[in-house]
């Protein structure tokens, strides 16, 4: 269920300022979005897997908090991130 190292590295490279930049909010939001997409597909295939459904809700809440922080700090960066990830906001 976790992201592969290659996929994580590509997301960090795409949204981060450097290869080792895993702590910035934009990278964290992008990584959470990838995990959410994977879990969403899993929950569609296995609708009775309640623990995965709860984990999905936890990840969505974490991403929501990070998006709120990103919007508060820099509106321009927030808008470009939401547009590049294809999120509804």
Swiss-Prot record:
<dbReference type="InterPro" id="IPR005290">
    <property type="entry name" value="Ribosomal_uS15_bac-type"/>
</dbReference>
<dbReference type="InterPro" id="IPR009068">
    <property type="entry name" value="uS15_NS1_RNA-bd_sf"/>
</dbReference>
<comment type="similarity">
    <text>Belongs to the universal ribosomal protein uS15 family.</text>
</comment>
<dbReference type="GO" id="GO:0019843">
    <property type="term" value="F:rRNA binding"/>
</dbReference>
<keyword id="KW-0699">rRNA-binding</keyword>
<comment type="subunit">
    <text>Part of the 30S ribosomal subunit. Forms a bridge to the 50S subunit in the 70S ribosome, contacting the 23S rRNA.</text>
</comment>
<comment type="function">
    <text>Forms an intersubunit bridge (bridge B4) with the 23S rRNA of the 50S subunit in the ribosome.</text>
</comment>
<comment type="function">
    <text>One of the primary rRNA binding proteins, it binds directly to 16S rRNA where it helps nucleate assembly of the platform of the 30S subunit by binding and bridging several RNA helices of the 16S rRNA.</text>
</comment>
<protein>
    <recommendedName>
        <fullName>Small ribosomal subunit protein uS15</fullName>
    </recommendedName>
</protein>
<dbReference type="Pfam" id="PF00312">
    <property type="entry name" value="Ribosomal_S15"/>
</dbReference>
<keyword id="KW-0687">Ribonucleoprotein</keyword>
<keyword id="KW-0689">Ribosomal protein</keyword>
<dbReference type="GO" id="GO:0003735">
    <property type="term" value="F:structural constituent of ribosome"/>
</dbReference>
<keyword id="KW-0694">RNA-binding</keyword>
<feature type="region of interest" description="Disordered">
    <location>
        <begin position="1"/>
        <end position="23"/>
    </location>
</feature>
<dbReference type="GO" id="GO:0006412">
    <property type="term" value="P:translation"/>
</dbReference>
<dbReference type="InterPro" id="IPR000589">
    <property type="entry name" value="Ribosomal_uS15"/>
</dbReference>
<dbReference type="GO" id="GO:0022627">
    <property type="term" value="C:cytosolic small ribosomal subunit"/>
</dbReference>
């Amino acid at each position: 269920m976790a992201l592969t190292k290659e996929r994580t590295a590509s997301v960090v490279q795409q949204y981060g300022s450097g290869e080792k930049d895993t702590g910035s909010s934009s990278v964290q939001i992008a990584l959470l979005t990838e995990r959410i997409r994977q879990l969403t597909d899993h929950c569609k295939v296995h609708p009775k897997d309640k623990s995965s459904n709860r984990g999905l809700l936890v990840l969505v809440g974490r991403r929501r908090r990070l998006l709120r922080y990103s919007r508060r700090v820099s509106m321009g960066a927030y808008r470009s991130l939401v547009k590049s990830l294809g999120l509804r906001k």
